[in-house]
C-alpha cells in the first residue's frame, strides 16, 4: 500500500492543485480533509466531491462548528482574547482545531504525514505544524506552497493543464480566511497601509455610516459562557451566529490594523468580527461587575499572554493549559445580563446586572441611605500612604546631607601664576 498524506483542504485553487502536486512530488496518495468551522460559502458535500475529482483517494468532511464554538471560541471569550489589543484571533483559533482533525484522520487512515496550503511567510504554517507536532510527533508536515515551489501562477497553469474542476479566478487579489468567529482579508491593494479599505471588501458587516434603527440586545452569561440572547437560550454557536447577523447589520466589528507576525514582519490586515467584538465587550463589562479589582488587574496580563500564545501557534502548550486553568477559575462568578445598543459601528453597554455582583448600591450611593463609613477613610489613607511618606523623609534627609557636605567643602585655592 502506498504511503498517504492527509491534506487540509479548503476547496480553493491552491489546495485543489495541491492534491496532484503532492502526489507528483512525493509519490504519496492524498487524502483530503475539509473541516467546517462555519466559514459558509459552498456546500461541504460539493467541496468533498471536488477533492475526489482533483485526485484525492479519499475525502473526509468534518462538521466542527459546535466544537469550534464550545472548545475554542468560548475559551477565547473568557480570555477576552485580542492580539495586540485589536485582533480577535479569527484564524489563530481555527488552526489548532483543524490540525487536531488532521492528526486524528492521519492516524485513523494510516498516513505518515499531513499537509497544508500555507505560504512560508505567514503565521498559519507555524500554527498547523506546531499543533501537529504537539499532538502527533510521529507525523511529518508538508507545505506544497512553501516546500514544493507551488506558486499561484504555477497552480493556475497546472489546473488548466489537468482540467481541474475549480474556478481559477484572478479577479480577486485578496487572500481571505473566514469562520464563524470572523473574516480576515489581506494582500492586494491592502498591502500599502496608506490605502483605505473599500466597501466591496466586506462581507460580514454593513456600512456603519449608513445609520439604521438601533438594535437592543441583552446577552446572558453563566460562568463566563454566553447562554442566551433576550432571554432565549442558545448554544454558543447559535449565539455567535445570531450576533454576527445583528451586530454585522450595524457595521460592528470592522478592524483595520498593522500587526506583528510571528515570522518577524509586519502585515496589514482587515478583519470583520461582529459577534466577537460584541461578545468581548459584553464579557469585559460583566467581569467589571463581578470580579475583584486585583483579580481583574492580574487577569489583563494573563489575557495578553494567552492571546500571544494562541497567535503564535502554541494552543497545545503547557503554559497555555496553565493559563486556561487560571482563567477558568476566574469565571466562577461571571454570570449575569449585559444590555447593549447596536448602532453605527458600535456595541454600547447600557445596562448590567448579576446575582453575583460586587457592586453594592448602598455603599456606592451618595444619597440618603449611604452605608459607607467615610470616617474610616482618613485612617486608611494614613496607612496607605505611609510607605511613601517614610521614603520621602529618607530621600529628603539624604538630599539635605549631600547639600551640607557640599557647603562644608572648602573652595580650592587659585592656582599660582
Curated annotation (Swiss-Prot):
Domain of life: Bacteria
Broad EC category: ligase
Pfam families, alphabetized: Arginosuc_syn_C, Arginosuc_synth
Name under which the protein is recorded: Argininosuccinate synthase
Stated family: Belongs to the argininosuccinate synthase family. Type 1 subfamily.
Family matches, as SUPFAM superfamilies: Adenine nucleotide alpha hydrolases-like, Argininosuccinate synthetase, C-terminal domain
Subunit structure: Homotetramer.
List of residues binding L-aspartate: 119, 123-124
UniProtKB keywords: Amino-acid biosynthesis, Arginine biosynthesis, ATP-binding, Cytoplasm, Ligase, Nucleotide-binding
Localization per Swiss-Prot or TrEMBL: Cytoplasm
GO MF annotation terms: argininosuccinate synthase activity; ATP binding
Binding locations of L-citrulline: 87, 123, 127, 175, 259, 271
A Gene Ontology term for the protein's cellular component: cytoplasm
Alphabetized PROSITE patterns for the sequence: ARGININOSUCCIN_SYN_1 (PS00564), ARGININOSUCCIN_SYN_2 (PS00565)
One BP term from GO: urea cycle
Main location: cytoplasm
Gene symbol of the encoding locus: argG
Amino acid at each position: 500500500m502506498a504511503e498517504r498524506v492527509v491534506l487540509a483542504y479548503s476547496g480553493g485553487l491552491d489546495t485543489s492543485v495541491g492534491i496532484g502536486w503532492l502526489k507528483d512530488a512525493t509519490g504519496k496518495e492524498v487524502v483530503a480533509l475539509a473541516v467546517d468551522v462555519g466559514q459558509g460559502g459552498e456546500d461541504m458535500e460539493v467541496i468533498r466531491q471536488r477533492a475526489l475529482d482533483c485526485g484525492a483517494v479519499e475525502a473526509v468532511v468534518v462538521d466542527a462548528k459546535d466544537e469550534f464554538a464550545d472548545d475554542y471560541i468560548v475559551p477565547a471569550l473568557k480570555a477576552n482574547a485580542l492580539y495586540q489589543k485589536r485582533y480577535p484571533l479569527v484564524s489563530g483559533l481555527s488552526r489548532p482545531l483543524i490540525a487536531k482533525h488532521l492528526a486524528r484522520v492521519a492516524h485513523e487512515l494510516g498516513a505518515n504525514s499531513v499537509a497544508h496550503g500555507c505560504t512560508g511567510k505567514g503565521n498559519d504554517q507555524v500554527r498547523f505544524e506546531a499543533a501537529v507536532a504537539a499532538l502527533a510527533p510521529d507525523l511529518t508536515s508538508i507545505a506544497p506552497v512553501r516546500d514544493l515551489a507551488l506558486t499561484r501562477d504555477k497552480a493556475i497553469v497546472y489546473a488548466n493543464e489537468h482540467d481541474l474542476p475549480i474556478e481559477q479566478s484572478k479577479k480577486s487579489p485578496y487572500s481571505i480566511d473566514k469562520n464563524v468567529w470572523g473574516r480576515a482579508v489581506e494582500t492586494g491593494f491592502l498591502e500599502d497601509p496608506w490605502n483605505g479599505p473599500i466597501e466591496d471588501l466586506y462581507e460580514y458587516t454593513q456600512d456603519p455610516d449608513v445609520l439604521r434603527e438601533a438594535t437592543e440586545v441583552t446577552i446572558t452569561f453563566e460562568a463566563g459562557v454566553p447562554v442566551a440572547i433576550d432571554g432565549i437560550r442558545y448554544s454558543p454557536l447559535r449565539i455567535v451566529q445570531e450576533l454576527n447577523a445583528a451586530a454585522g447589520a450595524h457595521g460592528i466589528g470592522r478592524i483595520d490594523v498593522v500587526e506583528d507576525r510571528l515570522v518577524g514582519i509586519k502585515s496589514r490586515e482587515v478583519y470583520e468580527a461582529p459577534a466577537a467584538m460584541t461578545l468581548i465587550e459584553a464579557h469585559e463589562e460583566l467581569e467589571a461587575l463581578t470580579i475583584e479589582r486585583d483579580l481583574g488587574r492580574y487577569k489583563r496580563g494573563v489575557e495578553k499572554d494567552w492571546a500571544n500564545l494562541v497567535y503564535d501557534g502554541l494552543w497545545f502548550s503547557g503554559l497555555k493549559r496553565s493559563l486556561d486553568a487560571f482563567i477558568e477559575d476566574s469565571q466562577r462568578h461571571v454570570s449575569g445580563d449585559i444590555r447593549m445598543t447596536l448602532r453605527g459601528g458600535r456595541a454600547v453597554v447600557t445596562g448590567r446586572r448579576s446575582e453575583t455582583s460586587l457592586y453594592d448600591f448602598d455603599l456606592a450611593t451618595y444619597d440618603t441611605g449611604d452605608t459607607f463609613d467615610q470616617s474610616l477613610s482618613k485612617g486608611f489613607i494614613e496607612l496607605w500612604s505611609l510607605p511613601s511618606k517614610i521614603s520621602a523623609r529618607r530621600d529628603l534627609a539624604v538630599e539635605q546631607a549631600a547639600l551640607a557636605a557640599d557647603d562644608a567643602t572648602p573652595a580650592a585655592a587659585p592656582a599660582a601664576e
